[in-house]
Structure formats: C-alpha cells, structure tokens
Design a protein with these regions (language model features):
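PLP-dependent enzyme catalytic core of the Aspartate aminotransferase-like
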Residues: 145-146, 153-163, 169-200
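Helix C-cap/helix->beta junction micro-motif
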Residues: 15-16, 124, 159, 200
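Conserved core segment of the aminotransferase class I/II
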Residues: 44-111, 118
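Active-site pre-lysine segment of PLP-dependent enzymes
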Residues: 1-55
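A generic structural signal for well-ordered alpha-helical segments
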Residues: 13, 121-122, 155-156
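A short linear hydrophobic-aromatic micro-motif
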Residues: 125-129, 161-166
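Conserved glycine-rich beta-strand-loop-beta hairpin in the small C-terminal domain of fold type I
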Residues: 93, 109-118, 128-142, 173
Length: 200
C-alpha cells in the first residue's frame, strides 16, 4: 500500500473513530510507505524480525501504537509472557544495531531472486502470477489437474521442493513460493517444479 492509499484509509477510519491495525511484517523494499502510526493516532502497527530482516528463528517482534493501546498490550503481555529469551534479545539488538546493512543485503537478495522468478514465470507455460512488490514471497497460479494440496505433497515427496499449497489461503490452484534463499537453491527448485509441472 502506498502513502496515498493509507491516507484514504485513515480518512475513512477517522469518520467512524475506528482503529487501523496494520501488519507491517511484509513491508516492501521498493515501495516504502509510511507506517500507519505515523499517519494516524489510532493506528496500530506490528512488525518483527522474521521477514524483512530474515531472522525468523528468534521470534522477536513489536507493536507501535498510541500510549493508551500500548498500556493495554503491556498489561496483557505481563499475563502471557514473563520475558523474551536473553539470547533472542541479544540477537535482536545486534540485528537492529546493523539494520541498514542487513536490509541492504536482503534488498539485493530480493531483487536478484525476483528477477529469477520473473524469468521462470515467463518461460513456464503452466505458471502465472500477479508480480509481487519487493517482498520475500510470491503467490503463483499453477495449471494443474489435481487438488493443489495433493500436488504440493507429491512435489515435496518426489522432488524435495516445498511450496505452501494455496488452499491454506482459500485459493485452490495456487502455491506460495518463498524465493529469498540462495540463488542456486531457487534455480534448482524452480527447475524441479517445472519438471513436475510437465508431468502433470
């Protein structure tokens, strides 16, 4: 979502005095929009180190909001979690202290691998997509003659390629492909996916 779209959303929310809860975990590298909390006093933004920062294992995230909401969430957190792991906090601190270098590295991976995905989609007659913004995952439509869950399981068992079947998102005949990995791994995975598609 770009800034203009967010400002339209804020105007609608203000008319009815509504909060806007914005999941900013997948913020795009190439279309940086402002955070909802910078546009609206009733904006609530969540983010984490999992996606854009590529540190999913430590499970560290945050909520940004006005003071009233922050106090409610802090009280709730006290009842659900004593504290985060010390190691997790140390890794999170290190990542955030080196934020720009890490984001630049990840931006480069996204750009290069998205170009590989573009090439594969252009060549693969049984695949199509709405090209994603520069984020870490894509949602690809596949021309297959079986339930997508079965397709994904056979792809994993027969070729060692893992995709998330689209029925998990109420979209049959689609798969989610995470493409921010080593380029050679991505190329090999896409080749194997094409091999399996050609057999279907």
């Amino acid at each position: 979502m770009d800034a203009a779209y967010l400002e339209e959303l804020v105007a609608i929310a203000k008319e009815v005095d509504a909060y806007i809860f914005s999941d900013e975990v997948y913020r795009s590298f190439d279309q940086p929009a402002p955070s909802i909390v910078d546009l609206y006093e009733k904006g609530i933004a969540i983010n984490s180190l999992s996606k854009t920062y590529s540190i999913p294992g430590i499970r560290v995230g945050w909520v940004a909001s006005n003071t009233e909401v922050a106090d409610i969430l802090r009280d709730y957190r006290d009842y659900t979690m004593i504290c985060a792991g010390v190691f997790d906090d140390m890794v999170a601190t290190l990542v955030l202290e080196n934020k720009e270098a890490i984001l630049e590295r990840n931006r480069q991976i996204v750009e290069e691998n998205l170009a590989l995905m573009d090439t594969w989609i252009a060549r693969e007659s049984k695949a199509s997509w709405i090209r994603p913004a520069s984020v870490s995952t894509s949602f690809v439509k596949l021309d297959v003659n079986r339930p997508i869950e079965d397709f994904a399981l056979e792809l994993l068992q027969g070729y060692g390629v893992l995709v998330v079947p689209g029925n998990r998102f109420d979209k049959e005949s689609h798969v989610r492909i995470g493409y921010c990995c080593d380029k050679e791994v991505l190329q090999k995975g896409l080749e194997k996916l094409s091999q399996f598609l050609n057999k279907c």
